[in-house]
């Protein structure tokens, strides 16, 4: 049968396709949502968010029992950037409709002015007839800046969260005084851990990306 190509972009909803008769194998190419950037302080910029992971799986065999079954595709959204100001809220998380969303960025310190962390990216997942076959982790969020130092960038390697459920990225750590908020973890097969808020009037640290399947 001729090659059939379908492309799915982020919509915030679960998208579906049906495996047509005559299909022997499929190739899947996934990109997770990127982490949002941390916001700035007067002393410098926040950290950039990490890019979402790319996963490629080719020649996945399709059995006769899988013909006319449903492929579920959940494209992960990008995390939002942080904002600046006393107590500025962290960037909202990147969403994933299958429970693989990133965390929210950490809030800036309440006094007097710093940057908050960026939200973690949501993972992109593909399921066939309810079975997960591929996941591309979302990127970690960048950290907010303090007056004394910049926020650090989101990190594109995974350190798995111990929270439950484990597929969600961890929320960035809030700053309790004057300083930048931490970047959030990205969603993934193992959700990423968050970065910390800066000590004193310093920038925070970036979050970790989610892992892949």
Feature locations, PLM:
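Surface-exposed ligand/attachment interfaces on beta-rich extracellular proteins
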Residues: 10-21
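A short aromatic-anchored loop/beta-hairpin motif
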Residues: 3-10
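Intrinsically disordered, low-complexity, charge-biased terminal/linker regions in eukaryotic proteins
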Residues: 166-172
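Local beta-strand/beta-hairpin segments that build beta-sheet-rich folds
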Residues: 132-134
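Glycine-rich strand-loop-strand elements at beta-sheet edges
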Residues: 11, 32-128, 142-160, 167, ...
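Extended extracellular/luminal ectodomain segments enriched in beta-structured repeat modules
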Residues: 20-27, 65-69
């Amino acid at each position: 049968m001729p090659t059939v190509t379908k492309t799915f972009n982020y919509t915030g909803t679960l998208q579906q396709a049906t495996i047509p008769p005559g299909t022997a194998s499929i190739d899947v190419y996934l990109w997770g949502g990127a982490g949002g950037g941390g916001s700035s302080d007067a002393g410098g910029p926040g950290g950039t968010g990490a890019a979402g992971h790319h996963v490629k799986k080719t020649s996945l065999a399709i059995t006769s029992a899988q013909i006319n079954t449903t492929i579920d595709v959940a494209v992960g959204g990008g995390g939002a950037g942080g904002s600046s100001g006393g107590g500025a809220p962290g960037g909202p998380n990147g969403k994933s409709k299958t429970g693989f969303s990133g965390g929210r960025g950490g809030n800036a310190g309440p006094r007097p002015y710093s940057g908050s962390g960026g939200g973690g990216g949501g993972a992109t997942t593909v399921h066939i007839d309810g079975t997960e076959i591929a996941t591309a982790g979302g990127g970690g969020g960048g950290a907010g800046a303090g007056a004394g130092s910049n926020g650090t960038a989101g990190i594109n390697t995974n350190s798995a969260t111990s929270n439950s459920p484990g597929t969600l990225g961890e929320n960035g750590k809030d700053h309790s005084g004057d300083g930048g908020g931490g970047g959030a973890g990205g969603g993934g097969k193992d959700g990423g851990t968050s970065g910390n808020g800066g000590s004193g009037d310093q920038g925070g640290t970036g979050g970790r990306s989610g892992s892949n399947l």
